[in-house]
């Protein structure tokens, strides 16, 4: 696990941090559950990514909005249901069988992960004020990384409610916001970058070097949620598993990315550890 007494920059020096996408789901254990988070930590994940959905009466749950039909076999959305109904729902496993696992609250997830790893809060933009309060109430401010898109509304809400949290804007192709955010007092620790080709500015050696000189980290997505959605130029989990880890994860590490998000945390962690010499970093020199 990362040393949470150190900065995220320091923890990423020896090798890229492993971010487990919705934990590690397999067998009967669904994603975005405490069980999936525990499984990811057992495999060496440094960061857990989780999604947040808000019920009709404002309660925060760990669930990917819009995936209700896939994971809960219901036609409604959590945002349209009162919390008393959400609390009774049960998740389904990949075979379509109902499990014993319910939809965890965000407070339960924070309590489970407190002091154990970084927590990457996705869908933060759905309720920046409310999720920010939940983070503070749970006392996990120093281990949470929040992110939003780059719309004026989203960035305004971050400035107003979450400027002290570790924040990463999600940028596609070109980063034209991190410098401005830092100048506005936002604790902008870097960026999550999406790119279709390796020729795009946000994955160029010059940009990566510049970001590292400014003490910022870069977050890449190797997970594949839809093979038609290209967000890391094909340097994916699929490529890493089917062609060998150097075909995906290795190239992301060589480019200098500091955090790699994956659905295969154990495989990625073992691969990165195998690249670390007796002294040095598993990948291109960065911070």
Where does each model-flagged region fall?
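Phosphate-group recognition and catalysis centered on beta-loop-alpha active-site segments
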Residues: 1-287
């Amino acid at each position: 696990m990362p040393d949470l007494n150190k900065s995220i920059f320091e923890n990423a020096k020896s090798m890229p941090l492993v971010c487990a996408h919705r934990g590690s789901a397999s067998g009967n254990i669904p994603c975005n559950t405490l069980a999936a988070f525990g499984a990811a930590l057992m495999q060496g994940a440094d960061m857990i990514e989780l999604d947040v959905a808000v019920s009709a009466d404002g309660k925060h749950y760990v669930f990917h909005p819009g995936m209700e039909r896939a994971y809960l076999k219901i036609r409604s959305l959590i945002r349209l249901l009162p919390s008393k109904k959400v609390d009774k729902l049960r998740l389904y496993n990949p075979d379509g069988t109902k499990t014993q696992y319910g939809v965890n609250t965000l407070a339960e997830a924070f309590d489970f992960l407190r002091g154990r790893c970084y927590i990457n809060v996705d869908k933060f933009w759905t309720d920046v004020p409310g999720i920010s309060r939940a983070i503070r109430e749970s006392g996990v401010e120093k281990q949470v990384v929040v992110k939003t898109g780059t719309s004026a509304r989203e960035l305004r809400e971050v400035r107003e409610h979450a400027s002290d949290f570790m924040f990463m804007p999600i940028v596609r192709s070109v980063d034209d916001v991190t410098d401005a955010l830092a100048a506005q007092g936002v604790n902008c620790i870097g960026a999550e970058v999406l790119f279709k080709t390796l020729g795009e500015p946000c994955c160029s050696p010059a940009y990566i070097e510049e970001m590292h000189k400014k003490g910022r980290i870069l977050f890449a997505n190797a997970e594949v949620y839809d093979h038609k959605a290209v967000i890391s130029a094909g340097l994916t989990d699929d490529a890493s598993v089917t062609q060998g880890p150097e075909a995906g994860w290795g190239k992301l590490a060589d480019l200098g990315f500091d955090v790699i998000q994956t659905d295969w945390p154990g495989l990625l962690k073992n691969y990165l550890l195998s690249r670390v010499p007796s002294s040095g970093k598993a990948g291109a020199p960065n911070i």
